[in-house]
């Protein structure tokens, strides 16, 4: 469907370069800072096949992030070369941990999240639970599948 939409936009006279740049190539400075911080502080397991990124509330404040900077950040760790399953933990204002897991085919994000009372599907799943960030990272690491 994306190609058909792009073709319709082109036929209608849309400036495709500007459209593409606005949708896919432009990030706020806050979002880029966040991505750098996540990579620097990520926990890589199973020879880089698994990554866990934890975002404490204090870091959001320290980096001066706004909600748009953090929106859909759960897909970012999965974009790291070689990563097959990625977990992002974000501490919400109420203190709960929001877990988002993304996986490539052959791995089950929902199975990881089910261990924390959550759900979803094999490619993307989530859960929210009460736990300290440090304990949550350890628990999520323990819940990850064995890599073959």
What is each of the regions a protein language model found here?
Residues 98-101:
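Primary mode marks residue(s) on the alpha4-beta5-alpha5 output face of response regulator receiver
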Residues 117:
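Aromatic-lined ligand-binding clefts that engage carbohydrates, nucleic acids, or primary amines
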Residues 1-85, 91-95, 129-147:
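A structured phosphate/pyrophosphate-recognition subdomain
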Residues 108-112:
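Short, glycine/polar-rich helix-capping loops at beta-to-alpha or helix-loop-helix junctions
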Residues 121-129:
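Short acidic/histidine-rich active-site segments
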Residues 104-106, 133:
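Helix N-cap motif at beta-to-alpha junctions
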């Amino acid at each position: 469907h994306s190609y058909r939409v792009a073709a319709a936009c082109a036929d209608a006279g849309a400036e495709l370069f500007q459209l593409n740049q606005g949708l896919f190539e432009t990030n706020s400075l806050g979002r880029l800072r966040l991505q750098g911080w996540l990579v620097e502080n990520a926990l890589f397991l199973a020879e880089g096949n698994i990554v866990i990124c934890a975002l404490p509330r204090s870091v959001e404040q320290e980096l001066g992030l706004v909600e748009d900077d953090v929106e859909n950040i759960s897909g970012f760790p999965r974009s790291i070369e070689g990563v097959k399953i990625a977990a992002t933990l974000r501490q919400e204002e109420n203190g709960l941990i929001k877990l988002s897991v993304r996986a490539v085919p052959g791995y089950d994000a929902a199975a990881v999240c089910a261990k924390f009372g959550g759900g979803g599907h094999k490619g993307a799943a989530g859960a929210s639970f009460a736990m300290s960030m440090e304990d949550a990272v350890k628990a999520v690491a323990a819940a990850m599948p064995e890599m073959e």
